[in-house]
Each structure stands twice: as C-alpha cells, then as structure tokens.
C-alpha cells in the first residue's frame, strides 16, 4: 500500500488491486510448483525464487510515478515467486529432517517466523516513510539478489536440494 498510495498516488482501490494481483500470483506460483515440482535440485528453485523476487522488486522501485500499470504485473510476478520459495523450503525441511524431530523443528520455525513478522513489517514502514518506498524496493530487491548469489555460491546450499542426498543425521 505504501508504494501504491505514496509513490504512484493511487487510491485504496488501487492498493487493493495490487494485493489481489500479488495473491493471484501466489496461487499461480503454487500451481506451477504443484505441477512441476520445481527444479530437480530444490535449492536452485529457492535461489531462482529469491532472485526473481529481488529483480522484480528492483524494477518496481525504479518505476516512475506514472507507471502504476507496470507495477500491477510486477506485483503478480512477486507473488508468484513467494510460494516457489516457501513451498520448496517446506518440502526440503520435510525431506532432510528426521521424522522424530520434524514437529519440533516446524514448531520452532513457526515461532521464529511469528516473532520476526511484526519486526519485518515495522522496519520497512519506518524506512519507507523516511526515504521513500521506491528506495526500499530497490534496496530490498538488491539484498535479495545478493542473497540468492551467495546461496548459489555456497556448496552446502547447492547440495542440500539435490534429490539424491540423504537426510541430515
């Protein structure tokens, strides 16, 4: 909403449309993941999703105020990247963690995510209010691309997603 209302000068209806398109993208990304299973190496699916989201976020941040119509499909694409990462990460955890620990690991993971979410929403709001939403999109997108590159360069990350690897002992 900050990008739509502030940078593009849109209405609350425009902000709702962006959210609907992001959600539709999530459904499409989920369908793609369900139909294909992602790349053979699951970690590459996660890397591609992070990099894809980052590239589209950078492009969105560079859009001029009159290019709201371009932001709409970009929102769809960012939404499509989300389940490609999250769904693949969940599948990797289920494959790699011994069943007797899986419930505890998912419980801890859920707790950490629930704790981090308010902070993850508050920090960007403050940043966007101070420096503008476009700069936040560019900065966070660049960070995501760098993270994806670091993941791709790390042998431990590249190898964990291979279908022929065993469980973590």
Tell me what each language-model feature is:
Residues 1-169:
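C-terminal transmembrane bundle of multi-pass solute transporters/carriers
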């Amino acid at each position: 909403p900050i990008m739509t209302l502030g940078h593009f000068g849109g209405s609350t209806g425009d902000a709702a449309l962006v959210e609907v398109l992001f959600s539709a993208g999530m459904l499409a990304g989920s369908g793609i993941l369900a139909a294909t299973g992602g790349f053979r190496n699951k970690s590459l699916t996660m890397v591609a999703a992070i990099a894809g989201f980052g590239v589209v976020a950078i492009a969105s941040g560079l859009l001029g105020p009159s290019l709201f119509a371009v932001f709409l499909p970009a929102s769809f694409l960012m939404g499509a990247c989300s389940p490609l990462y999250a769904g693949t990460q969940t599948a990797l955890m289920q494959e790699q963690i011994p069943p007797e620990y899986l419930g505890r690991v998912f419980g801890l993971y859920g707790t950490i995510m629930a704790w981090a979410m308010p902070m993850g929403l508050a920090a960007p709001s403050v940043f966007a209010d101070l420096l503008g939403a476009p700069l936040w999109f560019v900065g966070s997108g660049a960070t995501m691309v760098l993270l994806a590159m670091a993941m791709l360069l790390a042998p431990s990350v590249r190898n964990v997603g291979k279908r022929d690897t065993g469980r973590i002992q």
